[in-house]
């Protein structure tokens, strides 16, 4: 399924102010999540395999290029709040992104925001369709979700790309709404 037309550099018209804020919030997500509760990260999968056409296009590599894929779930107080899917081509993994090899359970922000060689492109956002790879991961943790809002950004080092996509699960939005209610009370 080609999902590339779901990603937009412009905010979706149906976004609330809070959703817009979080989907386009600059910088690393990890420290902001840590400020919201007891943060933990679980690596769901880290493997090599063919990239789908949309992912290959986003990385500017040939379709069916073998890629490195890392899927994680980020939890607050034990509750799944954000899922993420990061990928790059195997040649990039063996070159400019070699520090991702065996990366384990640490947040990618530890390397993405500490190297001056790493450049981040602007965010895109999407209302994920059921067939998107990140949606499949997200439905494992939020099977009743009516809508899955996500953002993604491409990071580059010397022309080699890493694509990082993050989906904010309903539990995340419930926490945000609760925090806003406390502020206005």
Swiss-Prot record:
It is an enzyme of class 4 (lyase). One of its GO terms (cellular component) is cytosol. InterPro entries: Chorismate--pyruvate_lyase, Chorismate_lyase_/UTRA_dom_sf. GO terms for biological process: pyruvate biosynthetic process; ubiquinone biosynthetic process. Pathway: Cofactor biosynthesis; ubiquinone biosynthesis. Disulfide bonds: none annotated. Keywords: Cytoplasm, Lyase, Pyruvate, Ubiquinone biosynthesis. GO terms for molecular function: chorismate lyase activity. It is found in: Cytoplasm. It catalyses: chorismate = 4-hydroxybenzoate + pyruvate. Its EC number is 4.1.3.40. Substrate binds at residues 70, 108, 166. Belongs to the UbiC family. Removes the pyruvyl group from chorismate, with concomitant aromatization of the ring, to provide 4-hydroxybenzoate (4HB) for the ubiquinone pathway. HAMAP family: UbiC. This is Probable chorismate pyruvate-lyase 1. It comes from Pseudomonas fluorescens (strain Pf0-1).
């Amino acid at each position: 399924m080609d999902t590339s037309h779901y990603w937009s550099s412009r905010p979706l018209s149906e976004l609330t102010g809070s959703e817009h804020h979080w989907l386009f919030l600059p910088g690393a997500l990890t420290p902001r999540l840590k400020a919201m509760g007891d943060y933990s990260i679980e690596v769901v999968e880290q493997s090599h395999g063919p990239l789908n056409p949309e992912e290959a296009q986003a990385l500017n590599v040939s379709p069916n290029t073998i890629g490195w894929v890392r899927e994680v779930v980020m939890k607050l107080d034990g509750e799944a709040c954000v899922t993420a899917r990061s990928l790059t081509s195997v040649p990039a993994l063996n070159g400019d992104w070699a520090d991702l090899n065996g990366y384990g359970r640490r947040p990618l922000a530890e390397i993405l925001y500490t190297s001056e060689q790493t450049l981040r492109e602007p965010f895109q956002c999407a209302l994920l369709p059921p067939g998107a790879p990140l949606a499949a991961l997200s439905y494992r943790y939020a099977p009743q979700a009516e809508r899955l809002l996500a953002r993604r950004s491409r990071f580059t080092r010397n022309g080699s790309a890493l694509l990082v996509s993050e989906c904010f699960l309903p539990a995340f939005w419930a926490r945000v709404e609760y925090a806003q209610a406390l502020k206005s009370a």
